[in-house]
Amino acid sequence: MQKRIKAILVLFIMYKIILKTKEIIESLKRVTLVAEEETRAVKFSVHDGLLVISSQRIGTGDAREERPVEYRGEDIEFGLNSRYLLDVLTALDGEEISLEVHDNKTPVVIKEKDSEATIAVIMPMIL
């Protein structure tokens, strides 16, 4: 059964973004302070070796953080519910994590960089 799941997940993966777990958790917590309370939507933009994490709330303002990342591929943008992502990230033990994406409409696969012991899948949000 596990082989079938991995085969399906591989179909979705086009780009791999490598991040330091603690740094991304800290950035997400700060950016989420400004996110809409109902959706907790956070936008991820990856380009030129940088990940830009941003959110906004009408009437309050916006937040933005940049983090260097290991990434090769075309520029990509996608949205995620920060609460779901934080739940996954705090459950992982590795120093680095991998966000694996195909585009902004397909599931995002999250796992430790050097391990496939735990694999999480989060559906993106349309922003």
Regions found by a protein language model. Give the residues of each.
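Extended macromolecule-engaging scaffold surfaces
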Residues: 1-127
